[in-house]
């Protein structure tokens, strides 16, 4: 009864030794500034969003002012994977392989409704969101997003890049789902959890 | 109607004695004309195995997610096997679960370069199925929409074709012109690319006031860009050298392979759906259909370029003849009643409810309406069983049938020619894979 | 030297230049003259002729389709040289058979004709291919097979075109195939990711490249028995 003594687990330590020094923060700033302002995109453009991406890269909206005019179609030379367009299941291993071929540091932007959630294509053929295949940093909604929308998403990504710290050890680790970890959810449990929202086996949606 | 066809002539060398395409060498000191000389004797490729290389599905120059597997003898293509389906999204299946007005949103996304043209095509097909005659104003607006979308699609084709050959600047010029059309469309229907501008029985919205001035401004300034691009490309020796004599299809082959649109017309067959099976009163507009005589990539470029000019001509006539009057038909069972009536009269409210919740129901039957899309003969085949959702919605994709001919066209050409030939077909994977 | 004479569409057509059709009747419009010619030439194969919204639909017996289409292509008074589409329709009513539909155009005569053949559900869905008449049938028939499971006899390379070859859920456009597929989303994703994108060369492609000879013995045996590596 009453207050119990605080255990070690509940105390967060803010000792000076745990913080970064001045040099480390300046280095972080420099590296992040360089990365954010020269993100080389890998346009994984499939459908209509790819046309809006091309319009964003063209003269009127001009991605070159953000340092992104050099489209690298080889994933090995790219920083950002911009998935512009719908991804069907046949294309799923391709985008996964492209993501694996990109070297760290890498980020990804899911452009458009179809890349983010499957969009208007809730059917047998389309992946319901590329975040089921690759990790996504920024989702840009729209069908297709206006060039200003995509630029807003790119600016958000730049903010995210600038807030990274070299001291965060785990940021740039590649994660494969480890079946033995507690983060892994087996497929049968996924089906069970998703059941109230309807899936193809039960077709509980209202016949749409 | 005046001249039916415009023969586009160019003295090409075509094929040489060995049956290989002749190359036009870079201009040296001729100063004026094109120096068409036979290239020096072609060395036979060194004896060796054939190489199998894979282009795509992720590739900058495949115009979408297309995969080409090429068997190469040195650098010459011996065989080409295309693989498609990487953008298959089940359009036709989902069309069976949507009302006719809802399907219009899907027609934007399949050929996304010609989105408003697809909306028009689908609305025409649905109106044939319903047995509706649309108003005169709607017809002219749809002609304006179709021609604007033809210009948009050809500009993307031009830009990306130039990039594939190596010229980057026309891409920027083309996209700048497209931004003007985007602004016009945005004022009209609210969206740039995925317009969903038509409805069964009319249009989603009438043009706002002042829109026609914007259109006339575009018509006035667009030919200058065309002249600029023409100056830079058409007689350019590098351009001619990279495109002449490639991917030749004879007229009989082209018809048998089911090619349509500029691919077919470049081979000398003057089939244009607007002239041969007209719709939207196209027979009353005065325009020419360019027809090539060589069937190669250069002729396809010339045909599409000329089509851009003809589209401007049609736009001018349409802008001059736009009649006043209602845009939508007056049938409340099919098209939404005006909001003022729907909120005040009971009957209109019921009609509004029925049209939105259930959707208009056509009689039992089927219809196939084909339009001339920038890619070719685009058709929507719809079968109705009397309910609000079609039994079958089939898209006849011109790029699908055009692309099937690529193994025939690239045989015997070099690897870099494969890219040029692929670009000249003007494919849209969204339409091919649906 | 490739220089072709311009082939004018409608060179054999008679009458006034074509105009936009207006006020087309639902049924019983003017049929295409080819329908009458077909009924005279193939009286037993033609089941019936309908005119729906101005378009002539000829129902042909499934076993005579190839002969009929061959005649339509070759005969000088018909000359249907352009195959616009090959597709199929399955109705929601389970009793109604599946229809295979061909859209033919005669460019010299400016005519459009729809040929339909009915295949009973429950029997093997097979019909003759028109690949030898029209090369455009190549991919169109492959797509019809992919979406409906209809086999085209005589097609040189009938395999799936839009879905991947080991797609196990079935034929998507059939009415008994649910909109979202038969498997759950996670299972669909797992099957899709299980394809190895790099091992996607088919038997045909490997044999071209002479890589076949360099494969290990057991793999060659498995491949020649028909196992697929990928596409």
Model-derived segments and spans:
Chain B
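Metal/cofactor-centered catalytic core regions of large enzymes
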Residues: 2-434
